[in-house]
Structure formats: C-alpha cells, structure tokens
Swiss-Prot record:
PANTHER family listed in its UniProt record: HOLLIDAY JUNCTION BRANCH MIGRATION COMPLEX SUBUNIT RUVB, PTHR42848
Residues the record lists as binding Mg(2+): T68
GO CC field: cytoplasm; Holliday junction resolvase complex
Family to which the UniProt record says this protein belongs: Belongs to the RuvB family.
Residues involved in ATP binding: L22, R23, G64, K67, T68, T69, E130, D131, F132, R173, Y183, R220
Organism the protein comes from: Thermomicrobium roseum (strain ATCC 27502 / DSM 5159 / P-2)
Protein name: Holliday junction branch migration complex subunit RuvB
Region (Small ATPAse domain (RuvB-S)): 184-254
Leader peptide range in chain numbering: none
Function in brief: The RuvA-RuvB-RuvC complex processes Holliday junction (HJ) DNA during genetic recombination and DNA repair, while the RuvA-RuvB complex plays an important role in the rescue of blocked DNA replication forks via replication fork reversal (RFR). RuvA specifically binds to HJ cruciform DNA, conferring on it an open structure. The RuvB hexamer acts as an ATP-dependent pump, pulling dsDNA into and through the RuvAB complex. RuvB forms 2 homohexamers on either side of HJ DNA bound by 1 or 2 RuvA tetramers; 4 subunits per hexamer contact DNA at a time.
UniProt cross-references to Pfam families, sorted A to Z: AAA_lid_4 (PF17864), RuvB_C (PF05491), RuvB_N (PF05496)
SMART domains in alphabetical order: AAA
Ribosomal protein found in the keyword field: no
Length: 353
C-alpha cells in the first residue's frame, strides 16, 4: 500500500515547512504533555540560574507528538541555537565530528531517530556527551596517534520512537528521559483551535472537537485533518468548520469516529477474518496485509494498542473484544481466556521500554 495515509503520523515533505509555521516557540504556548512540560520548566530555570547548559535529554514515544517542537522550545528558552539532524543522516563518524565542532557554547543539538545511529558514530557520542570532547585517530599503522579535540558545552536532545533499540551505554548518558503520550481530546481540540487561528480558518468549538476526536491523539494528524476539512468548508460550506461539516468531510476521507482509516481496519479485519482473531505472528500478519513488519509495529500498532483493539502476547497478536465491536462483529466468548485484561495490558504498555 503505497498511497499516502491521511492519518500517517510521519510528516510529508510538503508538511515540513507548514509545520514550522504552526510550532509553538515557548513552553507557555505548548499544549499538553503537562508532566513533561513542568519538569522541563524546572530544569530550564535551574540551568539558567546556574549559567550552565541543560543536561542531555531523551524524548521517546510515537511519531507526531512534539519531540522536535520541544527541542526547538528548549533552545528558544535557553537563548541558544538549535541544530537539527537525524540518525540516518549521520553516516560516518566524520559527519558527526563536523557537526559537533561547529556548535557554539550552550547550543542544542537535536538528533531525531537517534536509535538509527550506526555503532561507529554512536561511539563518537560517548566522550562528546560525557567529557565534551572527541577522540580522533590521525594517521595509519605504527604512526597512528590519538588526538582529543575539546568541544563547547552543549545539550544533546535525542528523539526516538523505539526506545528499546537504544543501546544501554547511549541511553545511560542522558540526564533525563521523557515519555510523550498520545494527547487527550481536550488538549488536541485546543491545538486544532490554535492552528485554525493561525491559519485564519473560522471553526466552531464542536467542529474542533470533532477533528480532535478523530486525530488519533496526535497533533500532526489533527492539524492535517484540519487542513483537509478546511477545503470542504471552503468548497461546499460557507467557510466555517462546524461539527456537521467536519463529520461529512472526515467520513468521505474514510477516517472513522476513532480516527481509524482503511489500513487500520484492514489489519483488524485480517486478524479477525483470516486468523479467527489470532494469535498470529507479526511476519504472517505483515504478509497477509502486504505491509512491512516494522511498519506495522512502529506505525499502525501503537494507536491500536492504545485503543485496546489489539494485544501483543507471547504467541502473537490478537484482536480484542473492543476490535470486534468496533467492526460490528460478534465476539466469540470462547476467546476470553486469550485476552489480557485491558487495564493490565495498558500498564504493561506504559512500562514497556
């Protein structure tokens, strides 16, 4: 399935500039993630009072929840420059050394997808994070010698959607680690209303709530839906986004009341109709849906798990009673023993590294 999903959490190329215009610049403007925000506010103020750079920070959680935005806010609050790169973009140790040696004192270096750094590059980071220095080997053979280059004190902000893929030596070098969770409807509605004001799109409170309910707990997706609904309001309405118009537009876009699209429903229906609800292994499920296993795990599953529609068990994935009910199907009572109670499953997910 190569068609772009309107509810995909990853940004498209065309969205990257658009997102930049909507990002909050200060912590006070940032909506949601209250615990993270409060902790960061204290850490930033303490660092400012000591006249020191902030500790290295690690953000993890599903894509689209604001990790890049928080890095920008940290730099703005500290009054320093922000340098943005990603794990896949740093191919060689020399690439990272070049970035590090061009930082200024106090600067924030943001590395997205930090779990995708290759091992040689990662090892350069260890002394850079601990000692603010990099060790280079000059020359070859018997004439080779090691030279240590001092770096300015800086703050590394790492972001990952796959915390478990980070090596322990790298993870342990961060001063604080923050988990970003899916947003509730109230926070997402406030984000939609803020974006609508910036875009000068008239929207009612219940119109914003309808978009927020289908935004999958993810600001990036909610704002993307806002843009699409805006088109409907302009063409078939009077320009104002109401609840009725938002429902009409999102129904036509095949985004249901919980934000699921055709791919999500395909995964659930495949589990239910082809494998009797599971358990089924990830490789088999991927083959049956023509998706990559990693794509299912990192893109589709987090939200289905959050809703309690899907569970991971030692034997494989299973569809829950909630999934059957959402699809309008009768749940076989003889499957109850396969399920982990939802509250216990949610607790396991929140503690899952």
């Amino acid at each position: 399935m190569n068609e772009p999903r309107i509810v995909a959490p990853q940004p498209t190329t065309s969205e990257q500039y658009f997102e930049e215009t909507l990002r909050p610049r200060r912590l006070a403007e940032y909506i949601g993630q209250d615990r993270v925000k409060e902790s960061l506010a204290i850490a930033i103020r303490a660092a400012q009072e000591r006249g020191e750079p902030l500790d290295h920070l690690l953000f993890y959680g599903p894509p689209g929840l604001g990790k890049t935005t928080l890095a920008g806010i940290i730099a703005a609050e500290m009054g320093v420059n922000l340098r943005i790169t990603s794990g896949p973009a740093i191919e060689r140790p020399g690439d990272l050394v070049s970035i590090l040696t061009n930082l200024r004192p106090g600067d924030v270096l943001f590395i997205d997808e930090i779990h995708r750094l290759n091992r040689l590059v990662e090892e350069i980071l260890y002394p850079a994070m601990e000692d603010f220095a990099v060790d280079l080997v000059i020359g070859k053979g018997p004439a080779a010698r090691s030279v240590r280059i001092a770096l300015p004190r800086f703050t590394l902000v790492g972001a990952t959607t796959r915390l478990a893929l980070l090596t322990s030596p790298l993870r342990d070098r961060f001063g604080a680690t923050y988990r970003l969770d899916f947003y509730d409807t109230a926070a997402l509605r406030a984000i939609v209303e803020r974006a609508a004001r910036i875009l000068q799109v008239p929207i009612t409170s219940d119109g914003a709530e309808e978009i927020a309910r289908r935004g999958r707990g993810t600001p990036r997706i909610a704002i993307r839906l806002l843009k699409r609904v805006r088109d409907y309001a302009q063409v078939i309405g009077d320009g104002t986004i109401t609840r009725e118009l938002a429902r009409l537009a999102l129904d036509q876009l095949a985004v249901d009341e919980l934000g699921l699209d055709e791919v999500d429903r395909l995964i659930l229906r495949t589990l239910v109709e082809k494998f009797d609800g599971g358990p089924v292994g990830i490789q088999t499920l991927a083959a049956a849906t023509s998706e990559e296993p990693d794509t299912i795990e990192s893109v589709y599953e987090p939200y289905l798990l959050q809703l309690g529609f899907l569970q991971r068990t030692p034997r494989g994935r299973i569809a829950t009673r909630r999934a059957y009910e959402h699809l309008g199907l009768t749940y076989p009572e003889n499957r109850l023993q396969l399920e982990i109670p939802f509250e216990h499953a949610a607790s396991e997910r929140s503690s899952d590294a």
